[in-house]
Amino acid sequence: DRRVMISAAGALTLFGLGHAAYMIVSGLPGWGAFLAIWAIQGMLYSSILTPAGRLLRKSAHAEDRPSVFAAQFALSHACWLVAYPVAGWVGSAFGMGTAMACLGVLALVGLLIALAVWPAEDPAEIGHIHRDLAPNHPHLKDHPVRNNQHRHTFVIDDEHRVWPTQG
């Protein structure tokens, strides 16, 4: 999922910035070119959003999924709440090419954040230590400790409040 989503985000960002440069230099594209651009951007956007449901499902226990999906819905709409007014205000004040460039920069920021916080190596099971749990805690009984740590599919929950790190 990461490879598809990051690749599509990178392509969409570059395509958007290229489209902005074209519009600043040459103006709005013709109707046929506009439809082709719209279709390409839609395919790239769908390549980012379509795997998101699977990613969210893998990131939470079944009982937490409604909250995770609600949080993703709220966050995506908060981002749109920023992007739509920026597009409208910048587009009316400085032109559509400049608006497209601003949105391309916003997409680039999102891509850089994703690259920084989503590790390229993201194994399903992660070995980790629970210093705060008693040796007879049910979680440690479900996933026995071996070599001073235990492994299982890792999600943020009551027993795992932070993502394990290597240092």
For the regions a protein language model found, what residue spans apply to each?
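C-terminal transmembrane bundle of multi-pass solute transporters/carriers
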Residues: 1-121, 125
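Intrinsic disorder in cytosolic terminal tails and internal cytosolic loops
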Residues: 117-167
